[in-house]
Amino acid sequence: MKISKYILSIFVALLVFTHSNAAEKWDMALAYGASNFHSANATEFAKNVSDKSGGKLTIVTHPGGSLYKGGEIFRAVRTGQAQIGERFMSALGKEDPLLEIDSQPFLASSYSDAMKLYKASKPLTISALEAL
């Protein structure tokens, strides 16, 4: 009986130790091709996460809709089919038209105007995203 408990405790310790040191891998769904700046930014983000986590978390990017097409990314992440994804906010306009505010033509004609629009719309945008 003592031997069984001893072996069981060693097994549990090994299991916990192995699990705590295991690197985690996430798949990141991207709608745009690898050379697009959205995908390039995501690739840089993935590299930074891996570096900053000491390799404990690796994000594998899947550009060009190879994991999920653009219109499917939000649902895939929301339902846990993908751990992470990138899609610009205005693509969620069917969920809430407010999320298209930064894509409306002539609403902001400079980076300064875009920042003002962002600051003015941020509280409502956060509420809209939280409601999804």
Named regions from a protein language model:
Residues N48-T79:
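N-terminal, post-signal-peptide region of Sec/Tat-exported proteins
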Residues A46-K47, F88-L132:
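Contiguous mixed-secondary-structure segments that line small-molecule binding/active-site clefts
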Residues D27-E44, G64-K69:
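Extracytoplasmic "Venus flytrap"
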Residues V16-A22:
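Sec/Tat signal peptide C-region and signal peptidase I cleavage site
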Residues P63, G70, G80-G93, A120-S121:
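Beta->alpha turn/N-cap motifs
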Residues L8-V16:
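Bacterial N-terminal signal peptides
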Residues M1-L8:
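Bacterial N-terminal signal peptides that target proteins for export
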Residues S35-V60, A120-L124:
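Short, polar/charged alpha-helical segment
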